[in-house]
Amino acid sequence: MSKVRIRFVKLGKIRWTSHRDVARMWERAFRRVELPLAYSAGFSPRPKVSFGLALPTGHESVAEYLDIELVTEAQLDGESGIDVRALPGRLSAALPSGVDATAAEVIAPGTPSLQEDVASCTWRWVAVPKEGADLPWWSTDSWEAELSARVSAVLSASSVVVTRTRKGEELTDDIRAGIVTLELLEPAGLDPSHGMWLQAELTCWPRTLRPSEVLVALDPGLEERHVRRTHQWILRDGARREPLLEAYPSGATDAPHALERAS
Amino acid sequence: MTSLWPQIEPILAHVQKPARYIGCEEGAVGPGSLAGQVAWLLMYPDVYEIGLPNQGLQILYELINERPGARAERSYAPWTDMEAEMRRRGLPLFSVDSHLPAGDFDLLAFNLSAELVYTNLLNCVDLAGVPVRAADRGPEHPLVAAGGHCTFNPEPLADFVDLFVIGDGEEVVGEITDAVQAWKSGGRTAGSRQRLLHDLARVPGVYVPSCYDVAYEGPRLVAVTPRYADVPEHVEKRTIADLAAWPYPKQQLVPMTEVVHDRLNVEIFRGCTRGCRFCQAGMITRPVRERPAEQVRQMVSDGLRRTGYDEVSLTSLSSADYSGIDEVVTGIIEDPACSGQVSVSLPSLRVDAFTVGIASQIQKVRRTGLTFAPEAGTWRMRQVINKLIREEDLYGAVESAFSQGWRRVKLYFLTGLPTETDEDTLGIADLARNCVAVGRRHHQGASVTASVGGFVPKPQTPFQWFGQDTAGELGRKIGLLRDATRRDRGVQLRWHDPKATLVEGIASRGDRRVGAVIEEVWRRGGTFQEWSEYFLLDLWTEAMAAHGLSIDWYVHRSRDRDELLPWAHISAGLHEDFLWQDWQDALAAGNVAGPEGHEHSTPDCRWTPCYDCGACTGYGIEHVVASPTPPAGGSQGTGQDLSRGAEVPVLLRLGARP
């Protein structure tokens, strides 16, 4: 039994599809390239594919992961079997535009699942005032300084309590422990109304903290745009690394100038 | 002509299922320009996940896009949350391919598969920024076109639609494109719209309501008269003679989000001559035209490889009737490329053991429920509707299903059929109960779902003269069935809302005067009437009253032979004599108590002599079937002893009552 971990991106209009939609795209792609996936036994056999953390509908990512299990007989060398290094290219050709595989590696037996292993994610996004929100400080000359002060206040606080709505219920949480880093990058345009690029590393335990919750801590009148997950992180021997060892391919850079929208 | 995407995108975070609005399907044309093209916006007037799989629109989408100088894009009715955001921001209806405003297209072409979407058509035209009434449109506005089964009575929408296409669209779509091309090169000058519509009214299969005057005497329609000498009195439907010449869609759209019928769909034949008297689809799509088996296999294997789907549906009105269905299904299942992971589904299963045999073969991979449509609870009633399923066929099919591992069977029935008595209605409960008894011999947990719909008489069928049951009467019959099945744990009863059936009746056989009602319901916010959460009967009854129209007269009244029906100038090829005689035969079958009722049946003319309904002879075409004999196991009146149709197996007669 061999397991392969794949890194992929979700960019452009297709970011408006759901996590379940993406799972179906992958199932179709695996069938198109005739990858010998292992199937679950039983009444309704499904291919053995396990996805990592769900990406909220509407968010982009250059750091999505999934693990697949191949049938026992599958050979994993380029000569007679599956060339794992060629997999990203083959899969990308079979995936819809906007979803592309960028790396693939065989993972050792016993590797923890993505769900249990990923400890935190790095996000980039633009903060803008919500339509109709009353944010007088945002339109003054000192808006950048004010925003910067609010970021510092969050980081120096020992507790940051925010209220969010989940399934129609109001929940109050202290999110301070979930914010590993938070920084302002640069304004998203010449005018404050275009918003400000932010970057944060947010933990996934005990639950996945979302960029929108961080904005609530800065000002409940803010909302997020152009959210992109840039990294997922796991902990190994006390150090932080990505779920695949392979270096980032050059096409998937996350420098701010490359944040122009794909659509 | 610029994309509206930058304005659409900020809305998407605030609406349900944003993937409805992004396009991005595999097989789609992708963003492009309309410049210099005859531009069609193909519209399904319901939400994306219902509309996207529509095969008619997908066929036309490909045909138009293959044509030099033409481009087709698609649009669907925005859900209510999206519509509210669009109206608030002044955003018009847009295409999902290039996100271009609907008003930039030359034609807005709607598929009409159900009457309850009529108000959505008006809403989409309005969202496009086009006047809803055809008479208010000028040369700057797109043409509003409609096709699909509902256009066999176009009159309720005559005031809103510029042109209707009657019948198969494959050929006529090119002829319309050419006429619109000429209109565009002439500069769409003042008055040119009327000249174009006059030209289109002469294209066979095209009906332009504004070229016809309608006269009434009191409530009765007395004349529908062409306004020009060169416009035909009767508009004959278009029929493609050879399905093999149209292997479409070749690039079936693969949506990025979940839709209904989310699988590969391959049409294996068009038309049906089983002759079920209630069935509009079977009457208006004659004759039967089969796709050659080799082409079916090719379309399936190409389609599976291209799309990555693991399910294929072989579509038609009665797929088990396809000549050699066995071999085709086996070929797909055993194709090494499918590696045992592909399941095949056959919609509209015929009711017999042979069919279940095929079903067990094809659902090896994932066994879902099996559905049969006996349509009526007693043999007498089934003879009236000419759906000649004998009791023993049904129990044989059910026995076969349960013995081969199915635990759940679904049965479709109609209530409110002509001559129906309470005994017939309650026969539905008996039949369902008997099926559970058959199933219990195999599994303790065997269950049967009986799904009951109220019957709506449809234009161009032998039942077009019949007075529909009132909502109260349908409700009473459903009540009888609820009482009769209440204590049967194995029988689950489902039913369609009789109030929605009533509204369907208004639109189904309405005339032009009903248009004002549709408009008023729409103006008062009555969109998405197919969705129970938005359906509002009061809007319809109040609008009927406000316009002085009687529901009783339109819906519940039986018509005489000498009445001019509102759709009489639209022809599906069927002789009125044939339809009337079939209606009389139905009533006669209902009056014969006993086994002789089948003497009034109409056999399937694929395998028995022609009875000249008119569908072939009128157009100089004929059935295209690979086999001159009925399918193995012959059923539904072919090669069977119909005098034994009502016989219930002894075992069931003894043991079925609760």
Task: Identify the function of each model-found stretch.
Chain A
Residues 1-6:
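N-terminal, Lys/Arg- and Ser/Thr-rich interaction peptides
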Residues 78-95, 137-157, 214-215:
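Short amphipathic alpha-helices in soluble, non-transmembrane regions
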Residues 38-73:
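Short, charge-patterned binding micro-sites
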Residues 145-263:
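Core RNA-modification/binding signature centered on pseudouridine synthases
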Residues 62-124:
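Ordered, amphipathic secondary-structure segments that act as subunit-interaction surfaces
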Residues 11-39:
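N-terminal ordered "arm"
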Residues 8, 68-76, 125-131, 200-206:
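Short beta-strand-to-loop capping motifs
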Residues 36-44, 102-106, 161-168, 227-230:
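A short, aromatic/hydrophobic, helix- or strand-capping loop or linear motif
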